[in-house]
Amino acid sequence: MVSYKEAGVNIEEGYKSVDLIKKYASKTFTKGVLNNLGSFAGMFELPKYKNPVLVSGTDGVGTKLDIAFRMKKYNTVGIDCVAMCINDILCHGAKPLFFLDYIACGKLESEIAAQLVEGVSNGCIQSECALIGGETAEMPGFYRDGEYDIAGFAVGIAEKDEIIDGSKIEDGDILIGIASSGPHSNGYSLIRKLVEDLHKDFEGNKIGNTLLTPTKIYVKPVMKLLEKYNIKGMAHVTGGGFYENIPRMFKEDFTAVINKKSYPLPNIFSHLMSLGIEEDHMYNTFNMGIGFVLCVNEKDGENIIKDLIEMGEKGYKIGYVKKGNKSVELI
């Protein structure tokens, strides 16, 4: 007789990982959570809204995970997973409610799984949302030893008449960029081609650790700004950089004019460019130091930047909107 364990699935290790994961998930629970982790489904009670709309998003971390495997550092990529989902739904003004994760591996190691979920938990705490469920799949022979994949699913809520969809954007509105923490979770297939020695020094740290800096989560500053200002459009700068993501906030045919010299370019991007990437390709691939973009009325610009600074963020007027063809023009 062949056992499940002999086939490569360790049920006992699965039980152990669930116990380790529960303590991290419970730290994220908010008032709306109705049941504990381990049920067949997570349940969440909706707060009182007049005309609520649920806003959802799903994403993963991509090949940044390979850097984590090679550095044997697993407790930050969970933050990336949350950030990639949460920042997307934030673009429509949604307040995050809850999050679910999915972890897949060839051989389950409970301590590594727990570190991954520790990162997810930290990301949820930063996002003020609850981790109410997830799945850990052990699939022997499907993944190479020591490799994991992680993805997530986020749900937020917004009043229907307060959803930000870009329909109020006008010619002459300005664009405010909020600084990123590095490459975030995009462009790592290219980075891995160029950076072979992850233990090489970069500004007093191993470059592998620098590349594992978690994706910034913009929930707290943006939700505070939404209480005070008429924000007309928002963009999460991910894969495709400025060129692909900023036009996604436009409902009509506008062009975003971005001044490359309006903010300081972080050294990690200058370093990557020095390894052989053309500048235009950099802007087509990376966030180039700006992880989130707001489209606002010009009269609010200075006050928004001031508020961002007071909240510990770096905000810059990076450009403006003009009539065009859903494109980005760099100057």
Curated annotation (Swiss-Prot):
Catalytic activity: 2-formamido-N(1)-(5-O-phospho-beta-D-ribosyl)acetamidine + ATP = 5-amino-1-(5-phospho-beta-D-ribosyl)imidazole + ADP + phosphate + H(+)
Superkingdom of the organism of origin: Bacteria
Record key words, sorted: ATP-binding, Cytoplasm, Ligase, Nucleotide-binding, Purine biosynthesis
Pfam family, one: AIRS
Subcellular location: Cytoplasm
GO BP annotations, alphabetical order: 'de novo' IMP biosynthetic process; adenine biosynthetic process
Pathway assigned in UniProt: Purine metabolism; IMP biosynthesis via de novo pathway; 5-amino-1-(5-phospho-D-ribosyl)imidazole from N(2)-formyl-N(1)-(5-phospho-D-ribosyl)glycinamide: step 2/2
EC number in record: 6.3.3.1
Entry keyword Lipid metabolism: no
One GO cellular component term: cytosol
Gene Ontology molecular function: any one: phosphoribosylamine-glycine ligase activity
Record-stated family: Belongs to the AIR synthase family.
Name of the protein in question: Phosphoribosylformylglycinamidine cyclo-ligase
Organism encoding this protein: Clostridium botulinum (strain Langeland / NCTC 10281 / Type F)
Upper taxonomic lineage: Bacteria, Bacillati, Bacillota, Clostridia, Eubacteriales
Gene this protein is translated from: purM
